[in-house]
Amino acid sequence: MTGFTVRGFNHTGFVVTDLDRAIGFFRDLLGFEVLSRAPRDPALMGRMTRLPQPELEIVHLQGPGHRIELLHYATNGIRNADQPRVYDDGAAHVALDVDDMDAAVAASAAHGLELVGEVVTIDAGPNRGRKVVYLQSAYGLTIELIGPPPAG
């Protein structure tokens, strides 16, 4: 026994370089609702992150069954030239079930996301038979789209 119980997921967070574009992706393309957008206290966030006096703005968005947190550090001064690749240690993504893979890929491209590889059909595991693809944005998001289960 661990002495505590996980009661559910609270959110998935992404650090992004362009908060407005990331909001547009989740709100305008995916239909998520913006719950809050506000700067955070630099002293408090510095204690949490060990980054001295970070200038940070956080947005929370609600989607179907899950909340997304977008974080923008305006003054960290240590931006990575490249975001993690989908196969790098520590890389993260959120996977979204979509009802039309072709339409989702096209709409995502219109919002500046690019295919990492190609759309493939999974051959094993819980998503067997479903089409999947990774997408990345220039502002720090990696999204996996998962198409509907095969008919029958």
Protein language model features and the residues they cover:
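Vicinal oxygen chelate
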Residues: 1-5, 14, 96-152
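Short, solvent-exposed beta-strand edge segments and adjacent coil->beta transition regions
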Residues: 7-11, 56, 89-93, 130
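Short, structured motif recognition centered on aromatic/hydrophobic residues
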Residues: 9, 16, 26, 61, ...
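Core segments of cupin and vicinal oxygen chelate
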Residues: 15-65, 103, 110, 123-128, ...
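Zn2+-dependent peptidoglycan hydrolase active-site motif and core
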Residues: 80
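Short secondary-structure subsegments characteristic of cysteine-rich extracellular domains
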Residues: 83-87, 94-96
